């Protein structure tokens, strides 16, 4: 029997409000997870509205069965980085009224030791979002060069002791390969020089490996760039990020498309022509969870919501 793991959607009300739901609109939940945001969107859609969900986790696809009887809902098994292609396959480019992304690992993924995401629960060192394909964390750690590991830990985990930890992993794996999350977490805790308060020494390395194994930042970049091309005029984009790497990407993306393309000085272009290169405008300021939400769900603490709107020129 499959064990169920609870998931509380972060910034639920604020994220869906950011979409400015039209009852007859077409919306995309780019990170279905366990369906919390999708459920709220469906509550606000009318009988002719439509919601398309995307997720690459087979367990999320199974969870979507809860909406099997709702004709307004459909789900695609795949990565959100291919969002624009899925929209084109459906013939809906330029007709999407809103897209939401909730980046990061869901509570069910973290809480299920068999998925291998958590350094607090012993399980196979997997970390794949889609555990039906691709290289596992254990397989990568077994073959990666010290320089490659150090680069991943530094770039994706912002780990200050990246090279030292990479050397220690390489030395230990020559004796016994790392196959379990606890083995890796214990090694990092033993050799790490980190003194961050209230943060496990393995936090940054586990984050880095997960991001690398799943090509998360590349997927996010593709998803955001694809989203802006498929939105209808006045279509909304609600994006939740969970760590500084993600949030910087989202912030820069919105800023870049809000400013438009830089035009060489002296070109005979009108202001209206220059404005046509501006594709988005930011809606309000970044939103963080309330103290009450953090009390209910400690994992919401680091989340940030940013909302943007597709311009119509």
Swiss-Prot record:
Keywords: Cytoplasm, Methyltransferase, rRNA processing, S-adenosyl-L-methionine, Transferase
Recorded GO MF terms: rRNA (cytosine-N4-)-methyltransferase activity
Coiled coil feature spans: none
Example of a GO cellular component annotation carried by this entry: cytoplasm
Enzyme class: transferase
One Pfam family from the record: Methyltransf_5
Biological process according to GO: rRNA base methylation
Location in or out of the cell: Cytoplasm
Positions that bind S-adenosyl-L-methionine: 35-37, 55, 80, 102, 109
Reaction(s) this enzyme catalyzes, per UniProt: cytidine(1402) in 16S rRNA + S-adenosyl-L-methionine = N(4)-methylcytidine(1402) in 16S rRNA + S-adenosyl-L-homocysteine + H(+)
EC number: 2.1.1.199
Superkingdom of the organism of origin: Bacteria
Similarity annotation: Belongs to the methyltransferase superfamily. RsmH family.
Its job: Specifically methylates the N4 position of cytidine in position 1402 (C1402) of 16S rRNA.
Name of the protein in question: Ribosomal RNA small subunit methyltransferase H
